[in-house]
Amino acid sequence: MMPHPVQLGKKTRMSYSQIDEVLEMPNLIDLQKDSYQWFLDEGLKEVFDDVSPIEDYTGNLILEFVDYSLDENPKYNIEDSKERDVTYAAPLKVKVRLINKTTGEVKEQEVFMGDFPLMTDTGTFIINGAERVIVNQLVRSPGVYYSREFDKTGKQLFSATVIPNRGAWLEYETDSNDIVSVRIDRTRKQPVTVLLRALGYGSDAQIKELLGEDERLLATLEKDSTKTTDEALLEIYKKLRPGEPPTVENAKSLLRTLFFDPKRYDLAKVGRYKFNKKLSLANRILGKKAAANIVDPSTGEILVEEGTKIDRETSIMVQDSGINEVFIYAEDNKVIKVLGNHFVNINKHIPFNIEELKISDKVYYPVLKEILDTFSQEEDIRDALKERAKELSPKHIIIADIIASISYEFNLAHDTGNIDDIDHLGNRRSRSVGELLQNQFRIGLSRMERVVKERMTIQDVDLATPQALINIRPVAAAIKEFFGSSQLSQFMDQNNPLSELTHKRRLSALGPGGLSRERAGFEVRDVHNSHYGRMCPIETPEGPNIGLINTLSTYARVNEYGFIESPYRKVDKKRGVVTNVIEYLTADEEDLLVIAQANEPLDEEGRFVNKRIACRMQFGAIDIAPANEVDYMDVSPKQVVSVATAMIPFLENDDANRALMGANMQRQAVPLLITDAPIIGTGMEYQSAKDSGVVILAKHDGVIDRLSSNEIVIKRDKDGQKDRYKLLKFKRSNQGTCINQRPIVSKGERVKAGDVIADGPSTNQGEIALGRNCLIGFMTWEGYNYEDAILINEKLVKEDSLTSIHIEEYEAEARDTKLGPEEITRDIPNVGEEALKDLDERGIIRIGAEVQSGDILVGKVTPKGETELTAEERLLRAIFGEKAREVRDTSLKVPHGESGIIVDIKVFSRENGDELPPGVNELVRAYIAQKRKINVGDKMAGRHGNKGVISRVLPAEDMPFLADGTPLEIVLNPLGVPSRMNIGQVLEVHLGLAAKSLGWNVATPVFDGANEHDIMDALEMAGFSRSGKVKLYDGRTGEPFDNDVTVGYMYMLKLHHLVDDKIHARSTGPYSLVTQQPLGGKAQFGGQRFGEMEVWALEAYGAAHTLQEILTVKSDDVVGRVKTYECIVKGENIPEPGVPESFKVLIKELQSLCLDVKVLTEEDSEIEIKESVEDDSGELSIEYGDLTYEADGELEIIEPAEEEQDTDVDYITEDDFESPDPEIDFDEKYLEDDFNSYDDF
């Protein structure tokens, strides 16, 4: 098949796709934006309505929340917020009304309720200057869940859980003796009949009448010791509140607050929907035979005759006629009674449209009947419905729900009803930003409510105003805590546009109210058939979070209940035509349907070509179905996978494990200096770049009026107004990569609204460009490809093909100390002019200076503590005036192993009116940019999970070359392909070779791209052999290699794991306080761990002296290491090692256990172990980096805080809690690091 051209932005790609796109892909970050918008429009209102009105205990004062508004113009815009380390937020103002019932006085005031963080256009929040993302959480949906277990004899035991959104759980279980018991709110279990009696069905006869005679019910009644409603209430009260005196009144009010108080028990919209779905009569009698005539209660008409099988339409008709109990024949031909929860479809009973009443379709029939019996006029009915909306679809559980759930439990034993799969996406829902925020806001408001009630009782009634009663601290604190430290509020992964996009579409099962890593078993993590088209089966992290953190599929969306929906094309069964009508289905709805795949061939009219079609049948089974039975068809082959996975060409030819690595590694690619869009793309590149928010889009149609490297001005067509677009230049991302935008339009060019006018990081002509197209060959070369190592051409280094810019931020702050303020100055003690050459008169480095490690960035001095003066000195001081105050140098210096060019300086000071943390007078930030060329030790990868480390950079003249003299750019190991089964990379290389020489850019979409024949045809067109192999020559000898080699273009990424960030060496440095051993890790400037097994190795070789010095003078023999240093400096012989500090610690530990431990010589005389360092260490100062260890008599050891130069005070800042990997929260990050000992803390 010949590819056809497709226009993507400014680029034309040759597409191999055969399936027409019926539905455009939705905006990929709408998920976040829509949810936040819902919160501002409706979510906030719901919370205020729930809390309002607040009454005091006497019922005299009433506080109502009338209205709220968010100020449109925040104090700082997005840029300023990032620069000043503040939160991008707008003030929330609430109109509050206070009513005094006795005097009838009404006071109304607008109350400021704190600053509310705003979402940026790209779906992120800026909290304390850092961009953060709130990820979506997957939680168990509220509802009624039934499960089955088998006892030792193989008998089925059913159990059930009734889960609300918030409130007490109800759990039913059947034991081997057929007794059904209930647990209320996780307390001890009791017979289920006790609960029924407490709900008003007091006698045995009433209960049997209610549920029908069932052997389980009779067994339970036998076990039940209570006989009346009052006894049952007391029995429940004793179990729930042991130790409190039980009274019937208390018991009643306890049950009322537990289940029937909307403030305590909330099903939420989704809970009511799930309850009605599970417990409705219609679903339970469907397909069963009626055991008695079913009669319409209002007309007396027989709806179903005895012995008739009930179909779907009849079952719904029976339910909507208000019938709530039906006798049916079970599978075992017993007659059983089925009880629903008495909800009906309101539209069947009311002739007019009720949309504007905002009542849900399903309503509680007894209340509806009462309204219809009382009123006959439409207006009256409308008003009554409005007034009793809360009773019609109650937010809390009602008695009918409880009885229906118990009836279901009894019916299950007779094979009536289904058990639930809790990993099914119909039973898991997504909580997005809006809902998470709403929950947090609700917590804050309920805390505030308590405060308001207390203040109402204390304050003078006449003087009370809304402002005086309301304390906004709890609300502000709840919001701040959520954004600052919730597990779901994560530091945005800003490596490249794709990683930003994916982060916003992440679904996490962890977090508050979710699962924990330890408890999650295999089932929760596994791919489920309901994930199809909703959650990507490929993209998930490797490691402890596998399967718990997922990504939304490309076309999926979240509905109002939080369930994930996937779009399908409707099949018109009458005509047998696949229409272009799109319907979104949840996993529940899909389970009952027959769905064809997107690549099923259709003719011109949209009819299926084949008579028998491979489909997904009921409950996810794959089977062949006749064409006339198909209900829906997939929209696109891409709908199964996520955005990152859809960017892997030939995904269908890769093993799933490697595809997972490929999808994850694309997110780790560093933006390169010279971007290069892939020759072999999938057609997803344009949309993902556009939606990620890193490129600039034109807001209106117009003409480019003027443009420079940092601004584009467009003259609008409509009204001639000018739109200005500011471009970001060399800004630092969260991960230290470089954000730089550049225009891709020219003056006078016409643009349409939504066109890309400027490229961002990792984009090229509006397409995502994460790496570079490299000419590669699959062959071995002198063992340099062993174990996936990569051999590269020096040309890539020289031409900056794989060079990236990295920007680091360093800050110095001048604080107030006890001895006086610190000062930022150029006047630093004991520093030569050479070191100050790049500092300006303030002592701050100039922009453009080139710095190496150890150079001063910001000169700063701190007052030194002065000793107590003697009387004579004080007298002299008084006569001759103040001697210069003693200060020490605490300048900010470039840390070890870092260097680069200063690209930006920011100075904030109190005097200029900047907001600074308490105790800070001045804050200076310096930004150092580094150009990092590709280097030995850097990690590179393709898009198919084929990763490796660069082992050697070879001169171009030594690289293998093609017949025309072109040297290869990269040599990869052919052995990396077969065992890994990622054949996609080979196809990519073949097609890349052909496309490059034909001058094509190719789009080969996943599951709908080029096949082997297409690739061979393309190779033939380009004049290559159909095998795709070519003759290669050795660059050193010029001889041809024995065999032909696969050569072509592969898209290679340079990953974030760069050798410059990892390589590290230490001379002398900080030591741990207790054990006196060197710290570990690059951040602490630590040493190399010499562990137990390394000691064995030296012991095995008998290297006694080496071993002794490693365990003593190179580690924790405090005196010995100082003396050794001294001897090396003076050129003397190294002294005998002393006793290691850890040995002394061990002895102390044993002594603390009351063991008298002594060290004896061979002659049994005791060896005295000195407690502290004696004066014989002399005066010595060890310098390393920017920390000076002065040993004046006793050795003073200073421990640096992580990357903090100010050794005097160790301040903990918020950044210390920032985790670089959004999937590890900070407490675990420290547990996972392999520190030498706990004392490093």
Curated annotation (Swiss-Prot):
GO terms for molecular function: DNA binding; DNA-directed RNA polymerase activity; ribonucleoside binding. Residues 1201-1224 are annotated as: Disordered. The keyword Transcription applies. InterPro entries: DNA-dir_RNA_pol_bsu_external_1 (IPR019462), DNA-dir_RNA_pol_su2 (IPR015712), DNA-dir_RNAP_su2_dom (IPR007120), DNA-dir_RNAP_su2_hyb_sf (IPR037033), RNA_pol_bsu_bac (IPR010243), RNA_pol_bsu_CS (IPR007121), RNA_pol_bsu_protrusion (IPR007644), RNA_pol_Rpb2_2 (IPR007642). It catalyses: RNA(n) + a ribonucleoside 5'-triphosphate = RNA(n+1) + diphosphate. GO terms for biological process: DNA-templated transcription. Its EC number is 2.7.7.6. The keyword Transmembrane does not apply. GO terms for cellular component: DNA-directed RNA polymerase complex. Transmembrane segments: none annotated. Keywords: DNA-directed RNA polymerase, Nucleotidyltransferase, Transcription, Transferase. Belongs to the RNA polymerase beta chain family. DNA-dependent RNA polymerase catalyzes the transcription of DNA into RNA using the four ribonucleoside triphosphates as substrates. The RNAP catalytic core consists of 2 alpha, 1 beta, 1 beta' and 1 omega subunit. When a sigma factor is associated with the core the holoenzyme is formed, which can initiate transcription. This is DNA-directed RNA polymerase subunit beta. It comes from Alkaliphilus oremlandii (strain OhILAs). The gene is rpoB.
